[in-house]
Amino acid sequence: LAPRAVRQLLVRLLDIMLAFPDLLLALLAITVLGRGPENTLLAVGLAGIAGYARLVRAQVLQVRLSGYVQHAVALGEPPMVIILRHIVPNTLRPLLVLATVGIGYSILSASALSFLGLGVTPPTAEWGALLSEGRNFLDSAPWVSLLPASVVALSVIAITLLGRRVQTLIAKGGIA
């Protein structure tokens, strides 16, 4: 769709982003954007977008060369129909599975940023900030840190289990 030079530039930019850990990119984005809930979410999202973009690109290239898309082109279907009927649904399936894993990773990243004091600022309650505040009381009141740590862990486990279930449903053909 885009000229070749633009595509190559975007692919190289994605490669550069993938060369760095997501948390490091999120730290960089937080320093540029500033602290706050919206900026934390934006930083975590921007840091992880390269993986999604590469997956979508690879899926589109693979589906575009598949037999059923080639048949649709040969039959004269309009490009928009081919995109909406064949390419988008077959690209969304693996993206949905990756998104469930990404949500768990985003929860951990946002909590880590807040734990370091770079995410959401007090008095807003955030799991990482609660963990950071509770570490001063680990000797006398360990439950202060245990509760937010448990909630973070349980949330990530629940999202991961949901992702596995979605992957199983997709493999069985239960999700279109």
What does each model-found stretch correspond to?
Residues 1, 54-61, 156-165:
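A hydrophobic alpha-helix feature that marks transmembrane segments and, especially
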Residues 1-3, 75-77, 121, 173:
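A short glycine-centered flexible hinge/capping loop motif at secondary-structure junctions
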Residues 1-54, 58-59:
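Generic hydrophobic transmembrane alpha-helix motif, especially the helices
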Residues 5-7, 11, 61-65, 69-97:
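Amphipathic cytosolic juxtamembrane alpha-helices at the membrane-cytosol interface
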Residues 23-28, 36-45, 95-130:
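Non-cytoplasmic
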Residues 29, 56, 69-72, 112-116, ...:
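Hydrophobic alpha-helical interface/terminus motif in multipass membrane transporters
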Residues 33, 37, 44-47, 93, ...:
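C-terminal transmembrane helix and the adjacent membrane-cytosol boundary/short C-terminal tail
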Residues 122-148:
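Interhelical loop and adjacent transmembrane-helix boundary motif
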